[in-house]
Amino acid sequence: MSEIFWINKLNIKPRKTLGQNFLIDTNISRKITKLVQGQLADPIIEIGPGTGSLTNELLKDNYRIKAVEVDKQLTHLLRERFGDVPNIEIINEDAMSFDYSQLTGPWWIMVGNLPYNIGTRLLIKLITEVPQIHRYVIMLQDEVAERIVAKPNTKHYGSISVLFSLFTDSKLQFNVSNNCFEPKPKILSTVLTIQRETLVDEEIRFKAFEISKIAFQQKRKKIKT
């Protein structure tokens, strides 16, 4: 059944306050799933599964999924759609306040079409606080993706670029047309992969990141004055 079927069945209305734009193109969901490249022993945490387009493709590959969805109506839809599937846990909770310490056991992979309104804040939180997530396959606003992979002396380079260069190997994978969503977003989307590196000097790197934030803040103040 198509994503439009599920949207219409429960009369789902995207909420702008949650930055909701539902992925309806199963070809894109499949391309994202192929980038996961995990072992079946690697459990997946999916943030913002929405109507379950990406969730459905991940389940076809027999991944074990913990899906975190803040919207109660969408949580109901997901439970109706996947309630009989044994290897998925659907959690109605805000990804920003979710207790990630429960991600125990083997390394985790995070997959998701991140809501535009929390994408940057959530990624910074996860990279700095949740080392057990070792790989990310995510879609987010193209400008944020460009900032993550930006190199020094380029337009998008900033403190977030420093953070991800210190702790990860991040790569842009492909852009996603606005036509792949319902409703169509006004901003462009990009899929990227982030591999968190295992580091022995994380404390030093955190200090370097904090110094970079101060430096960029001072730079912005000078530009304003």
Please provide the spans of the model-predicted regions:
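C-terminal lobe and adjacent flexible extensions of AdoMet/dcAdoMet transferase-like proteins
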Residues: 196, 214-225
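Catalytic cores of RNA-modifying enzymes
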Residues: 1-214
